[in-house]
Amino acid sequence: MVKYAGLLQFKGTNYAGFQRQKNGTAIQNVLESTLSQINNRATVVRYSGRTDAGVHAWGMPFVFWGREDLSADKWMFILNRMLPKDMRVISVVRTSPEFDPQLSAVAKQYLYCATQERLGPLWDDFFAYLPNLSIETSAVISAARKLVGEHDFKGFSKKGSSVKSTRRKLYEVSVMFTHSRMYFSFVGNGFLYGMVRLMVGTLLQIGWGKQDVNFIDEVLSGNAVANYSAPAQGLHLVKVWLEPDPFLESVKANERDFS
């Protein structure tokens, strides 16, 4: 058996998040069941971080021990033949036994998408529907800037987390408004349980006039707690930066000089 690293793209609408559940409705349950069938033995995966129910991912890093007689490309082909249509493996590479996608994750990007009008069956599951509410865009942008930097984000987290520290650093927070749609992007060195949805919910409350821009300062200073979590379906895990990055190393190893 050798160790492989993969990137899993999934639509989270029908799942209870990524982390394995007793009732078997999580993405990890489905992925491990499929890998176990191919390996002819029980197979577990380790991944870069859990996601809530309904959250989508463009590329979740995971690792597993797999049959050596199958190439990385063959693993990807077989997995995509067996996994349900709302999951797709977009990369598989052989990696070192020491590689751990959780310990190697140095930064992540989340994107939150919201709309004030129905977009139709192709897009509705990927946007949070927030109808008929006017929003003060300048207030949202001003509030978003306050989130950038290193802070104690405990007030932007849900109960149930056992992390040692609630300090995180956000490198970039951007907000874009176009027609009836809103996009919130966050890049940081880590995120607490429920943190992104609570930040988006607070920014929306500020835009709706239900909170003042300075409410952000109150939460970050520990004098208030965010209490509105935006719906899960608008949240996307876009990218996880890894050091070392086995996918980048694989690309470099296969580069050719055509000069």
UniProtKB/Swiss-Prot annotation:
Q: What does this protein do?
A: Formation of pseudouridine at positions 38, 39 and 40 in the anticodon stem and loop of transfer RNAs.
Keyword Protease carried by entry: no
Matching entries from HAMAP family are given as: TruA
A Gene Ontology biological process term: tRNA pseudouridine synthesis
Q: Does the keyword Acyltransferase apply?
A: no
Locate the residues binding substrate: 110
This protein's species is Coprothermobacter proteolyticus (strain ATCC 35245 / DSM 5265 / OCM 4 / BT)
* Assembly description: Homodimer.
Listed EC numbers: 5.4.99.12
Keywords, A to Z, come to: Isomerase, tRNA processing
Provide a Gene Ontology MF annotation, just one: tRNA pseudouridine(38-40) synthase activity
Identify which residues the record assigns to the active site.
52 (nucleophile)
* Record field: catalytic activity: uridine(38/39/40) in tRNA = pseudouridine(38/39/40) in tRNA
**What's the name of the protein?**
tRNA pseudouridine synthase A
